[in-house]
């Protein structure tokens, strides 16, 4: 038997690849899940590409809020594409093997895209806060330069701070098991196979979650709390409705972003049903990219009209 796939306990060995076993407990029929997952992936690609093209095509959408939405669409495509091709290869062709470098690269990409997405949500929250609470200063503060600098900072911050995750994982010694009960290379799933101490890895993972995603989400919800307080003080029902409509689309995106991962992190059913946290982890990386564009189309009037014009369903985006 190939030493790379057999389970041994010789500490002198160093495995050369991991085996992604797929969804725990349902290996025999997990290929049936490939159909809905493929549809979600195609929806994520098509809908987010439609957002990007629409924003580029319609001059009325050349505003900071829509530029941020376009960047979010790019990140969503990257996040979904990081995991879905390999998952479908496992389900369709039983291609479970993945080299250590490719696995560590996937760990980095998942963490990087996820943290960048969190930062983009923070930028969108700041944009709405200034637009609603400081409307007179909005044109001078939220400019194209502001969007460029903010997104540049977010990408640089998250790109650099997530580098230690795969580096620390690569420094571990993998000498015994190489079978991962997962469809993707999750950091905690990989380092759990290491033969040496992984305390530093777990600590950095926890710190990254709190410092980046935790602080971003705290600021996001604080911003929307202030926005809600300001909106409730408006005398005009029309202005209140418009403000709430704009913010609700953003909040829907954020709930997609945070909802499933909260369930995945808490994984209350992990001991009884290991499938649940693994499946939720997969869904977290494909459902938000697929549903984010739908939430935007339903709640953002200008974007919806832009879709109609681009697809030949409408004549004038300004109507």
From Swiss-Prot:
One of its GO terms (cellular component) is plasma membrane. The chain crosses the membrane at residues 32-52, 61-81, 106-126, 146-166, 203-223, 244-263, 278-298. Residues 1-31, 82-105, 167-202, 264-277 are extracellular. It is a multi-pass membrane protein. Disulfide bonds join 103-195. GO terms for molecular function: G protein-coupled receptor activity; olfactory receptor activity. InterPro entries: GPCR_Rhodpsn_7TM (IPR017452), Olfact_rcpt (IPR000725), OR51/52/56-like (IPR050402). Residues 53-60, 127-145, 224-243, 299-319 are cytoplasmic. Belongs to the G-protein coupled receptor 1 family. Odorant receptor. This is Olfactory receptor 56B4. It comes from Homo sapiens (Human).
């Amino acid at each position: 038997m190939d030493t790379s796939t057999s389970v041994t306990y010789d500490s002198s060995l160093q495995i050369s690849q991991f085996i992604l076993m797929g969804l725990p407990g349902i290996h025999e029929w997990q290929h049936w899940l490939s159909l809905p997952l493929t549809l979600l992936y195609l929806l994520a690609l098509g809908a987010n590409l439609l957002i990007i093209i629409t924003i580029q095509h319609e001059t009325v959408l050349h505003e900071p809020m829509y530029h941020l939405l376009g960047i979010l669409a790019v990140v969503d495509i990257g996040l979904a594409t990081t995991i879905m091709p390999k998952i479908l290869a496992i389900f369709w062709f039983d291609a479970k093997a993945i080299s250590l470098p490719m696995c560590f690269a996937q760990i980095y990409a998942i963490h990087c895209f996820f943290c960048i997405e969190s930062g983009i949500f923070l930028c969108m929250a700041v944009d709405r806060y200034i637009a609603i609470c400081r409307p007179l200063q909005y044109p001078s503060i939220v400019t194209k330069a502001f969007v460029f600098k903010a997104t540049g900072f977010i990408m640089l911050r998250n790109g650099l701070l997530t580098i230690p995750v795969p580096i620390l994982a690569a420094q571990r010694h993998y000498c015994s098991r190489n079978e991962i009960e997962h469809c993707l290379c999750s950091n905690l799933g990989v380092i759990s196979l290491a033969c040496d101490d992984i305390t530093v890895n777990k600590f950095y993972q926890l710190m990254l979650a709190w410092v980046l995603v935790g602080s971003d989400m705290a600021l996001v919800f604080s911003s929307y709390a202030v926005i809600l307080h300001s909106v409730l003080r408006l005398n005009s029902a029309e202005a209140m409705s418009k403000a709430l409509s704009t913010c609700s689309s953003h909040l829907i995106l954020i709930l997609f972003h945070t909802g499933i991962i909260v369930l995945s992190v808490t994984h209350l059913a992990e001991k009884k049903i290991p499938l649940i946290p693994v499946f939720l982890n997969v869904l977290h990386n494909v459902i938000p990219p697929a549903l984010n564009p739908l939430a935007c189309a339903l709640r953002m009037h200008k974007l919806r009209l832009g879709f109609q014009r681009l697809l030949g369903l409408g004549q004038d985006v300004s109507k």
